[in-house]
Structures are given as C-alpha cells and as structure tokens.
C-alpha cells in the first residue's frame, strides 16, 4: 500500500518529542486517556497498550489490570521504563520496542487492545488494525482514541490549516471515518460498539470494536 507516512520518520519525530511530551500533550489528551483507561479496567484481564509512549497512562490503570506496552520510539519507551521502575508498577508485564503492524504476540493473547493517537501515525492503518484484532481474544475489545477528519464546517477548515504542522509531528491529518467503516467491512470479524467525540472540540473520537467470538 502506498503511504504518506514513513515508519522511521515517525520514530524519529517521537524521539524528538520524548523529553517534553508529557508537558506538551499530557493535559490535551487527558480526557481521552481517562475514558480509555476506565473502559479497559472495566474489561480487566490482560491489556495491550499500543503506542504506550512515555507510559503516562500506566500508573492510572487499576493494579489488577495486567499491562503490556509497545512503542516504536526507543526514547519514549525509556521514559516509560523509568516510570515503571520509579513507581513500582508490578502489573506491567513488559514494555518493548515494536512495530504496531507486526506485533510479536501470539494470536488471541489479550482481553483488550488500547491504541491512543496511533492509527493516523502509522504507514498502513488497515493492516495495523488487522494485527490488533489478531492478538485479541474472541469477544475482546479494540479501544481507539484518534483524530477522525471532519467532512465540513469550521473544524474542517481548522484541520486543513493545521495539516502541515500535523505532518511534521508524524500524524496523518486526513483520516475520514469512511476508512474505518471500509476496514471493518473488509475484515468481517469485528463489530462497532461505540463512537463518541472527545474534547477538545470533538477533534478526537473514542471508538470501540468487539472481536467476534466465532470467526
């Protein structure tokens, strides 16, 4: 698949952001992060956090929720590892540098996969989503928080103006809802259970899919 995003470029971009990521983005993404954690904790069991970054969310999960975290950026992951050691987070099983499209986990390994602000920052979103579903147990949930492009109105104008900066940050600014609809239809093994806007301005959405119990 042709792509406008380069994986190495994304890793470098987030490596540059690592020292200040929590300060710059922590509050902006807080609502989506808290909503996602609440859902994942409600599911419980073993959770995969893709794009775990600096590990900002790790200490906010319930201590009974078992966590595995992966990220493409080594500098970001080093901060996450330091956070786990400092806070003594015993429920974090592993943190590893990993390509989200080629997860080094067996099929049906997790009760939920969490991916916040990830699918617009990977070269092949559909193949990446396929691998998320692969590692889910039957009946497991895929929980996404991501930018979904507006089709019209003031938010559309804002997104177009913001697009050059978004690309420099390693994000794909144009990502319509139709891409997720098309992916789910082609995959055939997931069902949409929720979609709701997140602050600020509804620019991000929380999206949930459930993996079919029988494929």
Features from the language model and the residues they span:
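Class I SAM-dependent methyltransferase SAM/SAH-binding core
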Residues: 48, 53-102
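A short SAM/SAH-binding and catalytic strip from SAM-dependent methyltransferases
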Residues: 112-124
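Short glycine-centered segments of the SAM/dcSAM-binding site in methyltransferase folds
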Residues: 46, 66, 139-141
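A short acidic, Gly/Pro-enriched loop at the edge of an enzyme's catalytic core
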Residues: 101-112
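A short glycine-rich, Lys/Arg-flanked "PGG" loop and its adjoining helix->strand segment in the class I
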Residues: 126-138
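C-terminal alpha-helical "lid/dimerization" subdomain adjacent to the S-adenosyl-L-methionine
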Residues: 25, 145-200, 205
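Conserved alpha-helix/loop element of class I SAM-dependent methyltransferases that forms part
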Residues: 27-44
């Amino acid at each position: 698949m042709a792509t406008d995003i380069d994986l190495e470029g994304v890793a470098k971009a987030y490596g540059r952001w690592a020292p200040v990521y929590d300060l710059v983005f922590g509050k902006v993404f807080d609502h989506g992060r808290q909503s996602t954690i609440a859902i994942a904790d409600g599911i419980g069991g073993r959770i995969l956090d893709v794009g775990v970054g600096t590990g900002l969310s790790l200490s906010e999960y319930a201590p009974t929720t078992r966590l595995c975290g992966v990220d493409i950026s080594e500098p970001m992951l080093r901060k996450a590892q330091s956070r786990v050691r400092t806070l003594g987070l015993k429920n974090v099983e592993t943190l590893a540098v990993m390509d989200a499209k080629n997860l080094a986990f067996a099929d049906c390994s997790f009760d939920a996969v969490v991916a916040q602000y990830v699918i617009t920052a990977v070269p092949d979103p559909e193949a990446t989503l396929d691998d998320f579903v692969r590692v889910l147990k039957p009946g497991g949930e895929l929980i996404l928080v991501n930018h979904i492009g507006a089709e019209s109105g003031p938010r559309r104008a804002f997104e177009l103006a913001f697009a050059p900066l978004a690309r420099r940050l390693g994000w794909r600014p144009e990502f319509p809802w139709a891409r997720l609809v098309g992916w789910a239809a082609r995959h055939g093994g997931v069902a949409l259970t929720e979609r709701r806007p997140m602050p600020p301005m509804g620019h991000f959405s929380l999206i949930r899919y459930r993996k079919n119990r029988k494929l």
